[in-house]
C-alpha cells in the first residue's frame, strides 16, 4: 500500500468526465525492412504476453471514509483491458485520420476500478507505418515522465530484438522522491480531521477545485500536447 501525494490526490478530486486527468503520447513508427504482413499484429500479441507488470502500472486507487486515499497493488490484471489493437479503415489512413482516431481514444476517463493505463497499437497506416498510443493517469506520471519512461523501453540497436514494454520496467524512485514530503504533510493534516469535519473538508476541496476549473484557472492545465525528444 502506498499513500497518494497531495498533488496526485488533487488530480482525482478535480477529475470529471468533461475534464479527465490523464496524459497521452502518440508514437509513429516505420516497419522494419522485409517485415511480415502480420508484424504489427504480432507486436500487439507480444504486448499482451508481457504480464510482468511493475509499479505504478499494477496499482489501483482506493478511497475510504476511514483511511487515507492510497494505491493498492493488484496481481489480477487483464491485459485485454489495457492493450488494444486497431486497424484504420482503408481510405482513412492519412495522418489527419490517425490524429482524429487517437483524439477519440484520448477523450474518455480511465476506469478507476483497474490500473489507470492503456496502450493502443494502430495498424493500417500508409507507407509501411504503424502507431502506438500510450494513455496513463497523471497521478502515475506527467507527460515528460511518461515520455522518458517510454524511451527507456526502446532498444539502442536495430539488432536488439528484446521487447521491453513500459509497464514491465522498474521505474526508480516512484512513490518515494516524488511523494515523500507531500505524504508526510497529508498524514499530519488527515490526523487532525475527524468525523463530519473530514467530510466537509473533502467536499470543500472538491468544490474549490471544480470552481477553479469553472472559471478557467485550471481547465486543460495538463492537457496541452507537446512533442518530446526524451532520452
Which sequence ranges carry the predicted segments?
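Soluble acyl-CoA-dependent acyltransferase catalytic core bearing the H(X)4D motif
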Residues: 1-7, 26-37, 45-55, 59-231
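M16 family metallopeptidases and their MPP-like homologs
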Residues: 7-15, 19-29
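Active-site regions of oxyanion-processing enzymes, predominantly non-cytosolic
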Residues: 40
